[in-house]
Amino acid sequence: MNYFLRFDTSLLPEEEAKVLICGSGIGGLATAISLKELGIEPLILTRGIGNTYYSQGGIAAAVLPDDSPYLHYCDTLRAGRYLNHELHTKLLTYEGIFRILDLERWGVDFDKKNGFYETTLEGGHSKPRVLKVKDYTGREIYTKLLKKTEELGIKILHGELQEIIIEENGVQGVIYSEEGSLKFIRTPLLILATGGAASMYYYTSNPKKVRGDAIGIAFRMGATVKNPEFVQFHPTVLKGTNLLISEAVRGEGAILVNDRGERFVNELLPRDEVARAIYNQIKRGREVYLDLRPVAQKGIKIEERFPTIYSFLRERGYDPYREPVPIIPAAHYYIGGIEVDDRGRTSIQGLYAVGECSCTGIHGANRLASNSLLEGVVFGHRTAYQVYLDLKILKPSKVNFRSERAGSDKPNLGIEELKKLMWNYVGLERDEEGLTYVKKRILSVLSQAKHWEPTPQNRQLYDILLVALCTVEGALMRKESRGVHYRKDYPTEREVYRRDTIITRDLFEL
C-alpha cells in the first residue's frame, strides 16, 4: 500500500512551497532559520509543541577550556557502544560549538557565571559540558527560535501531515489535515522534523502530539529505516505521569533508592544501565524512589536550580526537601529512524529528515545525555545548506494526484493495546518468543488494513504499526545485547553485530 487516504489534489485547497518543513522542534526551526539566512523562503507545517519544549537537562557541547570536541566524541562513542557513525559523530561534536553560537545569536540565553558558561555533569559525560537554562533549556530554545522565525517572517501553518506524495521523480508534495479538512501543499523538497516514536509504548515521557507516524509514512513510501530496535528509556519519570525528572538532578547529587532505602546503581551510568537497574528492582516487587535531599544538602536550592521540576512535584503533593519521590523508567527517545546522510538526505529524492525522526547514526546503540538538541541544530544547519544546493535542480510539478482507495472496516487493534504489547515484549528486556509474538500480531492486523476505512485516524494507526513492526524486526535481527537493546536470550555484545540494522519495505508483504 502506498497512499492510505482517498484524495484528489485537483479538488483540494492548494498551496505551493519551495521547501516544506514538517515539525517545529529544534531541528525544524534551526533548519528554517538557516534556510532563511541563505535567502530561501521555507514553509513550516506543525501540529504543535513537541519534545524540544519539554527538554529539561540541556544541550551538550565542549565549550569550556578543560574540555574538547574529541573528548565529547569519545564519550559519545562509549555511550553508543561503538555502533556510532564515526564521521557523523565528529561532525556533531566539532561543529556543535559553532551551532551553540548560532543559538545565542538567535536569542537563546544560556546560564553563565562570571562570563563563563555554567555547565553541569550528566551521565556518561567525562566533563561537565551540558549547557542549560535552569531546568527549562528546551523551552528556552523553542520559544527563542520560534520568536526568531516570526521576526524573519517565516510562514507557519498548523495542521497534521497525512500523506507524502511521492512519484517516480521524487517528492511532489504533501496532504495535510486542518480542522477536519484535507489540503494539499505542492513542493519538491520536504524536510521531516516530526520527532520520534517513543510514544508507541505504554509508559512514555513523550507528549501526546509526538506520535512517530511520519516515520511510518516515509517508510510506507519507500524510505529506509535504520537501527529501529534502539529505543531509549528515561530512568526517572514521575510515577503515574509522563513528567520526566532530568538527568541533571542526578548530576547535582540526587540518588536512587528502593523501598528499603538501599542504593542499587551508580546514578551517573549511561541511561540504559540505570533504566534496567530500576526495571529489575520493580520486577522484584520493589518500589524505586529518587531522593533529591542530597542536592539540598550541598547548599543548592532545588526551587532555583530546578524550578520546573520543583513546581510539578509540589503540584502533585511531593516535597523533595522532605521525602524521595516515586519514579519508573519510560520510553523517552527513538534512537533509530529514517536513514539519512550527513546532510539530511534520505533514500528518496527530495525527502530529508532531521532530529529524532531521522537516524544519522551519531547515537549508536545508546544516546548520550543532552546530545539530541545538539544533533537537531547541527544537522538542521547542514541539511539547510544541502537543500540550498538541491533547489537549483528540484522544481515543483504541475500534475495532480489521486488515490482511489476504499474500505469500510474498523481496525481490529487499538493504539492502547499496541502500546501494552510494545511495553511488555519490546521494552527494556526482550527475547525471541515475545518479539515473534508481537511481530505476528502486528502483521495479522496489517494484513487487514487494505479493508480499513480511509480516515486520518486509521491512517495514523497504520503508520504507527509500521514503525512498531520495524522496531520489532530490528530487535529480532539483532541477536545480541548492545546499549538500550537488551535480549535476555543473547545477554552480551557480539562483535559480528557491530553493524547497522537496515529495514526496507520489501522485507514485508504488506
From Swiss-Prot:
Disulfide bonds: none annotated. The active site is at residue 271. InterPro entries: FAD-dep_OxRdtase_2_FAD-bd (IPR003953), FAD/NAD-bd_sf (IPR036188), Fum_R/Succ_DH_flav-like_C_sf (IPR037099), Fum_Rdtase/Succ_DH_flav-like_C (IPR015939), NadB (IPR005288), Succ_DH/fumarate_Rdtase_cat_sf (IPR027477). Its EC number is 1.4.3.16. This is L-aspartate oxidase. Pathway: Cofactor biosynthesis; NAD(+) biosynthesis; iminoaspartate from L-aspartate (oxidase route): step 1/1. The gene is nadB. The record marks 122 as: Important in orienting the L-aspartate substrate.
